[in-house]
């Protein structure tokens, strides 16, 4: 049987509506949604090698800058040596494993092994990063080829192709300054002036390098560097670097805002003064149908007490499903919500009922001190707790009061176009919410405690009550046992008594029966004598009477 399309749509729409968050009922208890965004997850990253050439090519001004270059090399050594020693300490203890096949002459690469005995103490993160470091390291031949290429180049950004067709980007942050300013000014400036200018520039560049790699001195193996921080060492032009790296993803801005592009140190050359980095720039995958909602709450008054509804700050919806959302590994951008891992996890059925419109399922807690929002702007309307803050109509100068039977006040242009609340002047729009929410028209959820001290106190009281209840239960069990024992004993006594009475009764009845039988026999003997009387001469009437 075919179902008409209109009937099918009519049947489907209610199901879809119940699966969404009921913003209307939530707004009655002070919960509103401030934003909604798509959900994207970071997928597998692509890697690109980048070389920071710390020593610029100064062939054209070498005679005037020997002193400054010597001091600059000494400063670089204080940064590079600790990093190089830490990298060597773990990479020299990681060796490849060769797996033998059936033929002894053929072996294949199977993985790497960490010499733990030689390494000593290392955390799990350091071990994992060390193995990844070993896999991304260049061999000695590639290092020598890279050194030769860096010596000859005098460009700020240089693309160096290795024998395996791998492109390595070499960057020098001071080279443009030398090429464009110092070299053309050699004829107008003295040699001392050129040296001083280069010295100041190198000192500033060293400061940027120190601020960039300084945090990595403690743990250079597992430390990560953001591309934003790296841009200072690359001359400040981050767009030029990203274009040279070949990244042209549509989510570039979102990845930059979420700091998704990371760099790790893979090699340090103390003699040639350069650092090799492995840059990972990920791609994003949008999870279709998942919407992340941000929630904000406004306090409301019940009599003299101020409450607010306890809901998570972020939730996610996908069709009928509503789930919690962990915003810790996420970045929020205009392009959407970007997470480095799955941030969705199940929500309790009671909280789901709350979001679907059952206000009695929404827990509430008392406002402590001045913490908590007392007004918020949503859909152009001002939702305010005018019982706790001063609400004033700026247009008329009158005070907007909130009756005791109201928990919130909704102010729109039909009531007051310009509102002053808590010292802030706000122009509101046309009405989107009812003018007020009355206490008798809404079911409120159970009160709970969120403060650590209050939670501890409540738990202590609950434990005390449980102990008392346990003692009372033990006492009641003892009483029941005694009552049960007493009832059994009394019943036995009663049965024995009844039995004795029955036996005595039977004996008495038996004796009575025997006595009655004896009496009846005696009377029979009296009434029937052995000799008959002489009735001779007696009249017939007398005899007949006898």
Swiss-Prot record:
<keyword id="KW-0165">Cleavage on pair of basic residues</keyword>
<feature type="topological domain" description="Cytoplasmic">
    <location>
        <begin position="513"/>
        <end position="546"/>
    </location>
</feature>
<dbReference type="InterPro" id="IPR000776">
    <property type="entry name" value="Fusion_F0_Paramyxovir"/>
</dbReference>
<feature type="glycosylation site" description="N-linked (GlcNAc...) asparagine; by host">
    <location>
        <position position="57"/>
    </location>
</feature>
<feature type="signal peptide">
    <location>
        <begin position="1"/>
        <end position="19"/>
    </location>
</feature>
<feature type="coiled-coil region">
    <location>
        <begin position="134"/>
        <end position="162"/>
    </location>
</feature>
<keyword id="KW-1015">Disulfide bond</keyword>
<keyword id="KW-1169">Fusion of virus membrane with host cell membrane</keyword>
<feature type="glycosylation site" description="N-linked (GlcNAc...) asparagine; by host">
    <location>
        <position position="25"/>
    </location>
</feature>
<dbReference type="GO" id="GO:0055036">
    <property type="term" value="C:virion membrane"/>
</dbReference>
<feature type="coiled-coil region">
    <location>
        <begin position="458"/>
        <end position="483"/>
    </location>
</feature>
<feature type="topological domain" description="Extracellular">
    <location>
        <begin position="20"/>
        <end position="491"/>
    </location>
</feature>
<feature type="disulfide bond">
    <location>
        <begin position="386"/>
        <end position="391"/>
    </location>
</feature>
<keyword id="KW-1032">Host cell membrane</keyword>
<keyword id="KW-0946">Virion</keyword>
<dbReference type="GO" id="GO:0046718">
    <property type="term" value="P:symbiont entry into host cell"/>
</dbReference>
<keyword id="KW-1133">Transmembrane helix</keyword>
<protein>
    <recommendedName>
        <fullName>Fusion glycoprotein F0</fullName>
    </recommendedName>
</protein>
<keyword id="KW-0175">Coiled coil</keyword>
<keyword id="KW-1168">Fusion of virus membrane with host membrane</keyword>
<feature type="disulfide bond">
    <location>
        <begin position="393"/>
        <end position="416"/>
    </location>
</feature>
<feature type="site" description="Cleavage; by host">
    <location>
        <begin position="108"/>
        <end position="109"/>
    </location>
</feature>
<dbReference type="GO" id="GO:0020002">
    <property type="term" value="C:host cell plasma membrane"/>
</dbReference>
<comment type="function">
    <text>Class I viral fusion protein. Under the current model, the protein has at least 3 conformational states: pre-fusion native state, pre-hairpin intermediate state, and post-fusion hairpin state. During viral and plasma cell membrane fusion, the heptad repeat (HR) regions assume a trimer-of-hairpins structure, positioning the fusion peptide in close proximity to the C-terminal region of the ectodomain. The formation of this structure appears to drive apposition and subsequent fusion of viral and plasma cell membranes.</text>
</comment>
<comment type="subunit">
    <text>Homotrimer of disulfide-linked F1-F2.</text>
</comment>
<feature type="region of interest" description="Fusion peptide">
    <location>
        <begin position="109"/>
        <end position="133"/>
    </location>
</feature>
<dbReference type="GO" id="GO:0019064">
    <property type="term" value="P:fusion of virus membrane with host plasma membrane"/>
</dbReference>
<comment type="similarity">
    <text>Belongs to the paramyxoviruses fusion glycoprotein family.</text>
</comment>
<feature type="disulfide bond">
    <location>
        <begin position="354"/>
        <end position="362"/>
    </location>
</feature>
<dbReference type="GO" id="GO:0016020">
    <property type="term" value="C:membrane"/>
</dbReference>
<keyword id="KW-1043">Host membrane</keyword>
<dbReference type="GO" id="GO:0019031">
    <property type="term" value="C:viral envelope"/>
</dbReference>
<keyword id="KW-1162">Viral penetration into host cytoplasm</keyword>
<dbReference type="Pfam" id="PF00523">
    <property type="entry name" value="Fusion_gly"/>
</dbReference>
<keyword id="KW-0732">Signal</keyword>
<keyword id="KW-0325">Glycoprotein</keyword>
<keyword id="KW-0261">Viral envelope protein</keyword>
<keyword id="KW-0812">Transmembrane</keyword>
<feature type="transmembrane region" description="Helical">
    <location>
        <begin position="492"/>
        <end position="512"/>
    </location>
</feature>
<keyword id="KW-1160">Virus entry into host cell</keyword>
<keyword id="KW-0472">Membrane</keyword>
<feature type="glycosylation site" description="N-linked (GlcNAc...) asparagine; by host">
    <location>
        <position position="63"/>
    </location>
</feature>
